C-alpha cells in the first residue's frame, strides 16, 4: 500500500482531534483512535511503491515506514500515559499536534523534491505551536510561541532558499565555490536552529519553560529530525557531487563542525547543571543533535546510514526521557532535581526506566546506535578533536548519574509522602440493592444508555454492576504504577532501537531518494 492512507489518517485525525477540543474526553478518544489507525496505516506502507500526485511523485520507503511506525507507537503511549497521569490537566492538543507532525514528516520523507520536503517539515513544525498555546494563552506563553514561530520561519526560509537556489540553472555561477558554500551553510544553520543547537539554543530553553514536558519531543526532536533527514539527503545529492569543482568548502565545514562540537559537549554539561527536569530533557536533545550537525559536516555519502540510525535512536530515547520526566512530575509534584531526593527508592519501575534510557542514549561499543554515532564523528572530524568527541559521548553519564545519586538519597518532603509501586486493590464496594419497580426491557435502546439499567435488565449481567466503580477505584489507586509501566515500555523500546532492532540497520542503509537540486 502507498503512503497516501497514512497521510489521510494523520491529517484527518489531527483536524478531528483539534476540532473536538471543547469536549476533552471525545478529543482524547478521537486522538487515540487516530494514532492507532495511523500505526496500522504506517505498517501497511510498501517500500518502493510510487504514486503520482499533483505532478509530483511520492514513494514509500522502509526507513520512512519505520520512522512513522515508531512515531505513531510512541505517540500513542505518550497520549495514554499523559491522560492517565495528568487527568483533566493533560495537554489536550497533544494528539492533534502529534498527528499533524507525523503527517508532515511522512510527506517530507516520501516526496522527491527537496524544496517541497522542506516546506512539509516547516508545516509540521508549526503544529508544535498548538501545544505551546494549550489552554487559555498567557502573555508569557504567547511570547514563547512567537519565539518558536520565528525560529521555525527563519530556519525554514534558509533551507528553502538554499535548496531552491541550487536547484535552478546556475549558468556561470556553477563554477563559483561560494554559491555552493553559502547554500550548504544555510541548510546546516537551518537544521541547527530547528534543533536548538548551540548557539541557537535560547529559543529552545524558553520553549522548555512554557511547553508541557510531554510535548518536548514533538517540538524539539521529531519535526527537526525530518528536516535533518531531508537536509542530509540534499547534501548527499547536491553538494557532495560538486566538491571537485567547488572545493572542500573548508571554511563552511569548519563553522558547521564548531556548532556540532559545541552542542555535543556543552549540551551535556548544560543538562548536568540544570535543576529543572524539563531543561535537562531539552539540553539532552541539544547534545544528541550535535551528532546530526556533524553528519552534515562530513560531506561524505558514507554518513547516510549511520546518521539515520542515530536519528531514530535519538528520537525514541528522548521521547522516553520526556515521558519519564512527566511521570516523575505527576507522581512527586515537582520537577526540580534537588527536591526529588529519594525518588528512585520510592519507584523501582521509574528507576529501571531511567536506566534503560541511559543505556539507549549512551550505549557501549557494538551497539548499533553507539557505532553509528562513532561513525559520524569519525567521518566528520580528524584527530585530536575526534578522540575528544569520542570520549565526550559518555558525558550524559553526568546528568544520569546525578539523577540516580539524588534518587537514592534520603527522602525529601516531596517523595516521602508519594505513593510507591506496590499494586493496591480497591476495597469491595457495598452491595447496592436493585431498585424496586418494573425491570427495564433489554430490547429498548434507552435501557443501554445507563449501565445500572442495562445490568438490571439482563440477569447474567447483574454481578457485573460494580465493575465500573471498581475499575475506576483500581485505576485511581494504581495510577502512578500504570504510568511508570508505560514509561518502562517506552524505555525498553528505546533500547531495542539503539540495539538495531526493528530492522533499523537495513532501513537506514537504503539509498538516498533522488532529490533534485543539483545545479546545471
Go through each PLM region and give its residues.
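Alpha-helical transmembrane segments of multi-pass membrane proteins predominantly involved
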Residues: 1-520
Amino acid at each position: 500500500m502507498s503512503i497516501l492512507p497514512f497521510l489521510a489518517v494523520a491529517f484527518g485525525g489531527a483536524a478531528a482531534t483539534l476540532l473536538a477540543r471543547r469536549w476533552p474526553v471525545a478529543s482524547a478518544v478521537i486522538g487515540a483512535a487516530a494514532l492507532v489507525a495511523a500505526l496500522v496505516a504506517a505498517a501497511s506502507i510498501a517500500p518502493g511503491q510510487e504514486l503520482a500526485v499533483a505532478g509530483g511523485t511520492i514513494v514509500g520507503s522502509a526507513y520512512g515506514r519505520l520512522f512513522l511506525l515508531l512515531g505513531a507507537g510512541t505517540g500513542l503511549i505518550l497520549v495514554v500515559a499523559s491522560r492517565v497521569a495528568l487527568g483533566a490537566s493533560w495537554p489536550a492538543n497533544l494528539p492533534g499536534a502529534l498527528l499533524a507532525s507525523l503527517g508532515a514528516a511522512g510527506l517530507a520523507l516520501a516526496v522527491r523534491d527537496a524544496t517541497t520536503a522542506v516546506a512539509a517539515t516547516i508545516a509540521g513544525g508549526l503544529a508544535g505551536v498548538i501545544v505551546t498555546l494549550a489552554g487559555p494563552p498567557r502573555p508569557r506563553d504567547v511570547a514563547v510561541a512567537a519565539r518558536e514561530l520565528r525560529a521555525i520561519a527563519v530556519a525554514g526560509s534558509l533551507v528553502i532558499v538554499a535548496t531552491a537556489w541550487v536547484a535552478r540553472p546556475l549558468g556561470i555561477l556553477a563554477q563559483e565555490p561560494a554559491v555552493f558554500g553559502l547554500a550548504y551553510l544555510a541548510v546546516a544553520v537551518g537544521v541547527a536552529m530547528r534543533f536548538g543547537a548551540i548557539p541557537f539554543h535560547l529559543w529552545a530553553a524558553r520553549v522548555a519553560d512554557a511547553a508541557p514536558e510531554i510535548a518536548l519531543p514533538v517540538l524539539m526532536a521529531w519535526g527537526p529530525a525530518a528536516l535533518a533527514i531531508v537536509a542530509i539527503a540534499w547534501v548527499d545529492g547536491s553538494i557532495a557531487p560538486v566538491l571537485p569543482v567547488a572545493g572542500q568548502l573548508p571554511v563552511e565545514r569548519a563553522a558547521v563542525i564548531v556548532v556540532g562540537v559545541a552542542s555535543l559537549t556543552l549540551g551535556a554539561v548544560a543538562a548536568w547543571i540544570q535543576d529543572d527536569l524539563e531543561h535537562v530533557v531539552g539540553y539532552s536533545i541539544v547534545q544528541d543533535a550535535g551528532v546530526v550537525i556533524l553528519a552534515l559536516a562530513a560531506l561524505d555519502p558514507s554518513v547516510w546510514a549511520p546518521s539515520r540510525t542515530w536519528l531514530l535512536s535519538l528520537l525514541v530515547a528522548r521521547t522516553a526521557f520526556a515521558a519519564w520526566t512527566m511521570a516523575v512530575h505527576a507522581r512527586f509534584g515537582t520537577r526540580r532535581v534537588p527536591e526529588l531526593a529519594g525518588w528512585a527508592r520510592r519507584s523501582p519501575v521509574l528507576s529501571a526506566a531511567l536506566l534503560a534510557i541511559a543505556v539507549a542514549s549512551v550505549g557501549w561499543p557494538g551497539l548499533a546506535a553507539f557505532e553509528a554515532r562513532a561513525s559520524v564523528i569519525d567521518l566528520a572530524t580528524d584527530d585530536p578533536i575526534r578522540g575528544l568527541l569520542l570520549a565526550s559521548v559518555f558525558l550524559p553519564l553526568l546528568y544520569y548519574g546525578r539523577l540516580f545519586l539524588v534518587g537514592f538519597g534520603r527522602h525529601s518532603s516531596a517523595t516521602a509522602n508519594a505513593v510507591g509501586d506496590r499494586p493496591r486493590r480497591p476495597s469491595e464496594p457495598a452491595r447496592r440493592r436493585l431498585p424496586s419497580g418494573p425491570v427495564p426491557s433489554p430490547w429498548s435502546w434507552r435501557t443501554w444508555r445507563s449501565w445500572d439499567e442495562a445490568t438490571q435488565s439482563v440477569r447474567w449481567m447483574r454481578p457485573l454492576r460494580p465493575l465500573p466503580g471498581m475499575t475506576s477505584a483500581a485505576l485511581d489507586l494504581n495510577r502512578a504504577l500504570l504510568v511508570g509501566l508505560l514509561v518502562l515500555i517506552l524505555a525498553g523500546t528505546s533500547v531495542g532501537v539503539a540495539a538495531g532492532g526493528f530492522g533499523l540497520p537495513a532501513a537506514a542503509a537504503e539509498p538516498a531518494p533522488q532529490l533534485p537540486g543539483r545545479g546545471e
